[in-house]
Amino acid sequence: MHEMSVATSLLDIVREELGKHEVEKLLLVRVRYGALANLVPEALEFAFEVLTTGTDFEGARIELVQNPVRLACGGCGREFEPEGRELLFSPCPACGEEVGHTVLSGRDLYVEHIEAE
């Protein structure tokens, strides 16, 4: 379960940011992740809870927001958001090409917002 290491890294980032602003109590961390980031949201939420229990961050919430996938067609270059389960092999809405697309976004993972006091 790599979500545990992801949660550890996210908490390291949060701890560093809180130190910069001289606040200690974490209330909420909002994380954005791409649909291709290979994250299981429930597993990340569980890992966050496990890692914060018994720490200064106990009781803090994690909010996960999924970013859509954006592709550039390998045939005509049009940018689009694919639909369905086979995201990378979705046909281009302009020319119908199904392969050779370039991923423009959807693999990202970052802390978008931190609430603390």
UniProtKB/Swiss-Prot annotation:
| Residues holding Ni(2+) | 2
Q: Which Pfam families match?
A: HypA (PF01155)
Instruction: Fetch the InterPro entries from UniProt.
Output: Hydgase_Ni_incorp_HypA/HybF_CS, HypA/HybF
Keywords of this entry: Metal-binding, Nickel, Zinc
Task: State the function annotated in the UniProt record.
Answer: Involved in the maturation of [NiFe] hydrogenases. Required for nickel insertion into the metal center of the hydrogenase.
Any GO BP:
protein modification process
User: What organism is this sequence from?
Assistant: Nitratidesulfovibrio vulgaris (strain ATCC 29579 / DSM 644 / CCUG 34227 / NCIMB 8303 / VKM B-1760 / Hildenborough)
User: What family is reported?
Assistant: Belongs to the HypA/HybF family.
Coiled-coil positions are none
PANTHER family linked: HYDROGENASE MATURATION FACTOR HYPA (PTHR34535:SF3)
Q: Where does Zn(2+) bind?
A: 73, 76, 92, 95
**Record protein name field:** Hydrogenase maturation factor HypA 1
Q: Name one GO molecular function term.
A: zinc ion binding
